[in-house]
């Protein structure tokens, strides 16, 4: 038996994250990366001190009232906490954490990717290439919209 706190990681995370967790915790992994039903989540929580869930695991009041006293923290691998009944967890004495602002830069980068792709017709060009339909060029072909000087 380990002296380390027991941690349930509910979804498959990167190998580096799982290895780091295993260094400091007695880790229980979801190797199949399957979404737990509410009852499965409760069953898995019975023998752990901490849970590292994603937004896909719902900690509703019905689930929270059945959580064991030994569970002390839900350390979310997500920005939001809308999947957690914070009032019920607070009443139970379970600390809830999240990762605020962790996705802000990535979201902005994806917004630029989508805007440039739409302006320059990247998706349409990709489909043409894959279908073998890109067999000519002309000065007006697939020009798209120039973004220089545009305001968002």
Task: List PLM regions with ranges.
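Phosphate-binding beta-alpha-beta segment of Rossmann-like dinucleotide-binding domains, i.e.
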Residues: 100-151
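An N-terminal-biased, well-structured beta-alpha scaffold segment characteristic
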Residues: 1-97
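Conserved hydrophobic beta-strands of the Rossmann-like cofactor-binding core
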Residues: 8, 151-152
């Amino acid at each position: 038996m380990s002296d380390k706190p027991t941690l349930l990681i509910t979804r498959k995370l990167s190998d580096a994250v799982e290895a780091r967790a295993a260094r400091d915790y007695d880790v229980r992994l979801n190797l199949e990366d399957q979404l737990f039903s509410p009852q499965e989540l409760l069953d898995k929580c019975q023998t752990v001190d901490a849970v590292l869930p994603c937004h896909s695991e719902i900690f509703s009041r019905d689930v929270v009232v059945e959580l064991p006293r030994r569970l002390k923290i839900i350390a979310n691998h997500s920005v939001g906490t809308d999947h957690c009944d914070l009032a019920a967890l607070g009443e139970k004495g379970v600390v809830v954490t999240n990762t605020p602002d962790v996705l802000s830069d990535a979201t902005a980068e994806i917004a630029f990717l989508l805007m440039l792709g739409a302006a320059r017709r990247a998706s349409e060009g990709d489909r043409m290439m894959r279908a073998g339909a890109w067999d000519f060029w002309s000065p007006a072909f697939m020009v798209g919209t120039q973004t220089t000087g545009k305001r968002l």
